[in-house]
Amino acid sequence: MGAWYWIGVAAGLGVAAGVLIAGSLRAAAVAVAVVGAAVGAALGYGIDAWQPGSWGDVVAAAAGGAAGGIGAAQVVRGALRRGGTRGGTALIVAGAALAVAALAWVPALGYLEAVALPAIAARLRRRSPETYAGLRTLAKD
């Protein structure tokens, strides 16, 4: 396989790391993205030491970690807001991270994961309703 394949694997594994971190940390999306990027960069460095890809592995995995963290943080936040338990949500998100990591080994899907997960999260964010919009109208005299 060429370097493009290993860069895609690094990006996909970075996304999986970001998803796992978003499910296990109780932090803001920015903090999850930073930690996800750091873990992704470490994964990318490991892949770079093992297979060709040069600095592209490290950059792709770091970007994937940040993208996965931001995307999954939106989903986790919504699940917890709607009454999901922290442990149950973390377990489900860990399973999703495992599935994302498995899909990263399919050629070109790692790239797709790094682009699709933040796009889905942005769509969810736009569709989320205003919280307690009706109560504000009742408070007016």
Can you name each region flagged by the protein language model?
Residues G14-G18, G64-A73, A116-S128:
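Alpha-helical transmembrane segments and their membrane-interface exit regions
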Residues A3-L25:
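N-terminal signal-anchor/start-transfer transmembrane helix
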Residues W50-R82:
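Alpha-helical transmembrane-segment detector that highlights a single hydrophobic TM helix
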Residues R81-R86, A90-L91, G95-E113:
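Membrane-helix boundary connector in multi-pass membrane proteins
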Residues L124-D141:
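Short, highly charged, low-complexity non-transmembrane loops/tails of multi-pass membrane proteins
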Residues G14-A16, G40-A42, L91-A101, L117-P118:
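Hydrophobic, membrane-inserted alpha-helices
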Residues S54-A63, A104-L117:
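Loop-to-transmembrane alpha-helix initiation sites
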Residues L25-V39, D57-A63, R82-A94:
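Cytoplasmic-side transmembrane-helix entry/capping segments in multi-pass membrane proteins
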